[in-house]
Amino acid sequence: MKSWSVNKIIMLISLFLLEVIDSQIISNNIINNFNTKQNSNNIKMTYGRFLEYLDMGWIKKVDFYDNGRIAIIEASSPELGDRLQKIRVEIPVGDSPLIVKLRTAKVDFTAHSTINSKGIFTQLSNIFIPLIIIIGLIFLFRRSTNFMSGPGQLMSFRKARAKVQTEINTDVVFDDVAGIDEVKEEFEEVVTFLRKPQRFLSVGAKIPKGVILIGPPGTGKTLLAKAIAGEAGVPFISISGSEFVEMFVGIGASRVRDLFKTAQQNAPCIVFIDEIDAVGRQRGAGIGGGNDEREQTLNQILTEMDGFKENTGIIVIAATNRVDVLDGALLRPGRFDRQVSINLPDIKGRLEILKVHAKNKKLDSNISLGLIAQRTPGFSGADLANLLNESAILTARRNKFAITMSEVNTAIDRLLAGLEGTSLTDTKNKRLIAYHEIGHAVIGTLLKYHDEVQKVTLIPRGQARGLTWFIPNDEQALISRGQLVARIIGTLGGRAAEEVVFGSSEITTGASNDLQQITNLTRQMVTRLGMSTVGPISLDANVEQVFIGRGIKNNNEFSASVANKIDDQVKIIIKHCYDQAVNIIKQNRFLIDQLVNTLIQEETISGNDFREQINNYTKLPKKLSTLSEKNNVNPKITESFVVF
C-alpha cells in the first residue's frame, strides 16, 4: 500500500467522523432545548388533578414529550388566578383513553418527537470502536511496511548490540588493575600471543580460544578484560549475555553470528561476554525444562567458538559469578579452555587497590591506607572504590578540604551497617543494650582465639541498636576449631550478659541474629567440617541449589538416626559455649559494670581504649594469629574449650 493512498483513506475517515460529530452536536441541541422547556415550568400537577382540570374545561392545550410520558399543559383556573400558565404533568404509561378524552373535550394536543440520547451513544460506539481498530491496524501496517522497506532496519535488529572499541588504546592497562597479581600473570601469555603470535606458532603451540573469569561481583573481571585489550593494543568488543535473547525467535543465534563476524573483521581482537550465565546455563534441565530460544543461542555460541579457523587471533573472554550453572560443553577444552578465579582481595591486595583509587582523592597526611585495608576484610575492589567515594562525599558535606580517618571510619560503618540513627534516650533500654554489646566485646577480648575488638558503640545503625566491631589480625584460608568455638562463645556473650545482669525473665530479642549465626556455624561444624563426635565426615557435600539446572529437590543422604545425632551435637556445642560465656561474664562482672558506665557516657569506645581499660583490671591474653603460634600452644589448654 502506498503512503499517499493511506493518507487519502485517513482523510476520508476524518471527514466521516466530523460529519458524525456534527450530527451529534445538532442532536444535543435538540435535547437541550427540550430540557430547557421542561426546566422553565416550575409548576407541576398530579395526573388525577389533571383529569379534574380536563373535566372542568380548564385545559386549553397539551404538548406531549418523551413518547407521551410527559405533558406540558396550558391551563387557566381560579386557582391559577384565571391566568394561562404552563404546567408539567407526568402521564402513566399506556393511558390510551386520555387521547379520547382530549378529543371529546375538544382540547388541542400535539405529540413532539424526541431523540434518545442513549441510542445515539450506542450508535456512536458501534461506529467508533471499529474505526479505532481499523485506524490502529493501518498505523501498525505502515510501521511494519517502513520497518521492512527501510534501509537496513530489519537487518540491524538482528545484529548484535556489541560495543566495538577499535582504538588501540582502551585507557586501561594492567597498572590500573590492582590486588590480583597472580591473575595478571596468567594473562601475560595471552597479551604476548596477541602481540607476537609467531613465538607460539613456531613451536606448534595453540593459544586458548577462550578464558572464563570466575569471581564474586565487583572483583574486577570486566576491568581485567579491558586491561588485556589495552596491553595487547587490539580492538575490544564487549556485549552482555542478556543482550542476545529477546522476544523474537532466532534473534539470539543471529546476533551471535553477527558478533563473531564483527570479531573476524577486527581480528586480532578480544571478545568480552559479560554475565555469560544469562545464555550459558545448562540445557534441558531444572523445573520447567529448557528454554528453546536460550538453548539455540547457546548452541550457536558453541558452534562459533569450535568453528574458528586455527590461530585467527580472536580470544573470547567471559565473566560470570555462577560457573556452577554453566553448560559442560561450554567449559570443555577448545572453547573456554581456562577458568581463572578472581577472589576477593587479601589485605595486601586491598592496600594496592586503595592506592589506585586514592590517586585522584585528596587525603589528609595522617590517613593510613594500611589501616583501612585492615578494617575492610571481605571488601571487593568495587567496594573499596565506593568506600573512598563515600568518604570524599562526606568530606565535602562537612566542608573539609581533605579526607581524614574520621570520614573513612564513618563510611565503613555506613557501608557495613547502614545509616546512622538517633541515639537512644531511654535509660533502661540504653543500659540493657550497653550490657549486651559489652558482653560481646569483653568475651572477644579475653578469648585468645577470638579476633580483637575494633570499636564498641551505642549509636544505632540500620536495624541494629548497638554494634561491636571485631577486626582480624590476619586473613587465613584455614580456620581452626578453636577459632570457630571462640566466635560462637563471643557471639553468645550478649545474651549471656543479659541473663546474668537482668535475669532470665529480662532477656530480649536483641540476640535473635546472634542465635541464627551461631546455629548455622555450629551445624556446619558438625555436617561439613567434621568437628564433632559425629566424626570426620561431610553430610551435605552433594546438596545443590534448586532451580538452576541441576536438580529439582535436595535429598538427605543420611538416616533419621544420624539426623537426630546431628541435632544433638549442635545442641551440645551451643550449650557448652553458652555456659562458657556465662562463666566469663560472672567472673568479670565488676569490670563489665565499669565498662558499661563508660560506654553509656561516651557512646563509643575504640578498640585501643577498650583493651587499655580491661588491662587495668585483668591481664590480657596473647592473641594467637598465626599457625606457628597455634602449634606452640599447650594442647591441654586448647582442649579445655574445644572438645565436646
UniProtKB/Swiss-Prot annotation:
The active site is at E437. Residues 27-119 are lumenal. Pfam families: AAA, AAA_lid_3, FtsH_ext, Peptidase_M41. Its EC number is 3.4.24.-. Its cofactor is Zn(2+). One of its GO terms (cellular component) is chloroplast thylakoid membrane. SMART domains: AAA (SM00382). Residues 1-5, 141-644 are stromal. Zn(2+) binds at H436, H440, D514. It is a multi-pass membrane protein. Binds 1 zinc ion per subunit. Gene3D superfamilies: 1.10.8.60, P-loop containing nucleotide triphosphate hydrolases, Peptidase M41. One of its GO terms (biological process) is proteolysis. Homohexamer. Acts as a processive, ATP-dependent zinc metallopeptidase. In the central section; belongs to the AAA ATPase family. In the C-terminal section; belongs to the peptidase M41 family. This is ATP-dependent zinc metalloprotease FtsH. It comes from Vaucheria litorea (Yellow-green alga).
